[in-house]
Amino acid sequence: MIALRENIAEMAGYVPGFQPLDVDSYIKLNTNENPYPPSPKVLEAIAKEAGEGLRRYPDAASRLAREEAAKVYGFDPSWIIMANGSDEVLNNLIRACAGEGEEIAFINPSYSYYGTLAEVQGARVRTFGLSESFEPEGIPEHYDGKLFFLTNPNAPLGFTYSQRYIADLAGRLSGVLVVDEAYVDFAEETSLELVRSFDNVVVTRTFSKSYSLAGMRLGLAIARPEIIAALNKIRDHYNLDRLAQAAAAAALADQPYFQECVRKIKETRAWFTAELQQLGYQVIPSSGNFVFASPPDRDGTRIYQGLYDRKILVRHFTDPKLAHGLRISIGSREEMEQTVKALRELGPGR
């Protein structure tokens, strides 16, 4: 018998969105990737780095990438840590803050991977629900768990919490509030200023969505230097390879390209939302690069299968709270036009 830890043997694990090997034969709208390529400057930086210098270890501190992030976000580099995807930061925050039997919390529905990461550490998981108006329910006036994860904008629903609400929540926690801003570049507000105002707020970002670098696995966190120092103690000492560091620095430096990609996605999101509503779909106003939409018959499974049969991938969740709808990533205008055409063919249902 292999001597696995009991909690590892019993846990279900996280299931990511379907990634077909023949990806180019699909319209892929199921994992919130960017429909546009990375900045040409990113590709140039990667090509320049992909030489004989790869025999050398990368900079363990990711200094050039952190310096570019400092310019973009307005923080000293000592407040920033680069990561192998924002998931690495989320994992290390749990490792740093929540021991076996200690509690972490998050809103359900949101990013369920928080729970998986906590299970690995043997931490207890507590979830709080949402009202029909998307107000969190049941959070105590003073919550003493070790970590509280808040996905803002929410995924998979796309709505945002106000900065006033987030500040109030930070003041009610004895532990760390992690504001997961994976999709914030498609929204209007960020919690970065709360990092300066509260010593228990951490903001995480990813390069997978707005910077078109899902394939590189890049992320970062911004927090007080003492939190960053703790995370640096437990991360892989060479957590970003040379190519990833070059890509991150170049992506952050090319803000005009980044802003134009975001503009086009937001424009397409508005158009697609209006088209869905004309078809009778209920669409939650979204601040992400996706929308959550329910068909007139509230049969998300029917629409998911119908789109799949037409080589269009979207995300359907089996959670009863979500099964009536679909999360649909915002692709190019052409991809979304083909998706609307397919939805018209599928009709409103019974």
From Swiss-Prot:
Question: One short Pfam family name for this protein?
Answer: Aminotran_1_2
Residues modified as N6-(pyridoxal phosphate)lysine: 209
Protein keywords: Amino-acid biosynthesis, Aminotransferase, Histidine biosynthesis, Pyridoxal phosphate, Transferase
One GO MF annotation is: histidinol-phosphate transaminase activity
Q: Which reaction does it catalyse?
A: L-histidinol phosphate + 2-oxoglutarate = 3-(imidazol-4-yl)-2-oxopropyl phosphate + L-glutamate
GO biological process terms held by the UniProt record = L-histidine biosynthetic process
- InterPro entries of this UniProt entry? Aminotrans_II_pyridoxalP_BS (IPR001917), Aminotransferase_I/II_large (IPR004839), HisP_aminotrans (IPR005861), HistidinolP_aminotransfase (IPR050106), PyrdxlP-dep_Trfase (IPR015424), PyrdxlP-dep_Trfase_major (IPR015421), PyrdxlP-dep_Trfase_small (IPR015422)
Per the similarity annotation, which family is this? Belongs to the class-II pyridoxal-phosphate-dependent aminotransferase family. Histidinol-phosphate aminotransferase subfamily.
| Protein name, per record | Histidinol-phosphate aminotransferase
Organism from which the protein derives: Citrifermentans bemidjiense (strain ATCC BAA-1014 / DSM 16622 / JCM 12645 / Bem) (Geobacter bemidjiensis)
Gene name, Swiss-Prot/TrEMBL: hisC
